[in-house]
Amino acid sequence: MTPVSAKFSTYLTHHGQKRKYPQFCFNIRIDQPDPFFQPGKTCMHFVRHLGAPPLRCESGVREQLNERTAFVDGSMIYGSTFDLEKKLRDSFGGRLAENYENLLPCNEKGCPRGIITKYHCFMAGDHRPSETPTLTVPHITWLRRHNLIADALRRATGIRNDEILFQEARRIVIAQLQHVTYNEFLPALLDDFTMNYFNLQSRSSGHSDVYNDRLDPRTINAFGVAAYRMGHSLVRNIVGHDRGFGKIQVFNVSDFFEVPDLMFKNGYEFMARWMSRAPKSRSDRFLVNGIRNELFKSPIEGEDSETMSLDLGALNIQRGRDHGIPPYNAYREFCGLRRARFFATVPGGLVDHTPQAAAALQRTYRHPDDIDLYAGGLSETPRKGSILGPTFQCLIGYQFGLYKHGDRFWYERTFPENAVAAFTQEELVQIKRTTYSKVMCSVLKNIGGHFHSFQPRLLLRPEIERNQLQSCNRILRGNRLGFDITPFARRLLRLRGRRRAALGVSFPRNPGTRFLRLVKPRSVFYSPINPGRVFPIRRRISFHRPKRTI
């Protein structure tokens, strides 16, 4: 895998600024002597996630507010509210707003934490587009992809209505994003058994009515606060610019948290090229120093007892305790795996860990039942064909299965209740020709006569068999978009730009912020293997930063 795959998913932990509400503080105590933080620094700042009322306002466990839509629906591109979407749009030709270098628009609120930068920070559908340079790249990629498709639709149809062009381009982009996610990203992450067990890959051709209206597709706590944070172990200490002709310049990742300067003056193109070819960090229990000790390091001294930087691993474990998720062993059983009764790696113990990883867990926890999900899952030995151990594979496959089978607007649906809302067979053929390498090739500018080349399977290294570098002209096959816009344009003209539901009412969006303030997934989980088993909440009170890496 490459850094492109490591950054396809976004960071899910964000830094809390200067605290305004002490009742929400859940600081992490630092024992001294600490191998990194200087004497006198006794706590690491941590703010709890905002609580939300239980379903129907009944009494129950504390739940957390999720302000994002619970589907692969491009909310990081378009936002999760109408107000944010309006700010992100250009109001001409169905396009999204860009800055003068075809990058993300300026964030009028400035940079997070009051950071002073040479260039302005960015605004996107997600609040973290400037968090790291490698996270900014996919934001810019899909912004440009939307505008490219909107322009192509305008030329092919002659339609000038901004709303029609925007919604149609958005519809195509979301379908392509879903296709790339389930047919390139997840196969690079999970083994064949997990992909097949949860029916994650799309059909090679045609429609697929996988929608199940009895499923609750919202994000389970274990996925958001532990399993999907597995990408943090793939982060490297450096980011880079590949300027072509063997000219590569590298930078410390810790120097560019929420600093967008590397994206300007063709920096996006240089960074995208570097990400496609550089190796990622190994998927294991270790985090690099740039995010374990120097995350969001500040040159400004905070309170006397507070650290000037953060430890992402510690924050992830504390976030799991903030949400009150059960321990590692509970999720082993949830996934049909055997619980660990002792720390040895023999049957009955930590059978999916190396002796070194098991010993590190034993030094940190008193009993296997005390192991936090993030620590236990991240330290598992990857299974063959995957970069993850069985527990995180199970949870990620389970959640993405819910996202797919619980999505009424999944791109492969036939929509028997309203066929106008579905893609035609001809349109699906074009969507299923989408690859991430085509998306990337379509949006990059050629700089100084240097033409881009990428491997066809962009999320995998070019050194693997049948994945050697190819020119973008060959990848796109002479079509700037990488697919034929004609079927979409022809149908849009036939519908006269109107895509209405059967009763003349537009289909609603997937649930947005207003809905999610009232509804949230439960914190008890039903096993996909044993539907009758239920695992309740288990809470912890505090967290001591481990002296050793686990």
Please place each PLM-identified region on the residue numbering.
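Terminal regions of secretory-pathway proteins
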Residues: 1-133, 150-541, 545-550
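Secondary-structure-rich domain cores
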Residues: 146-148
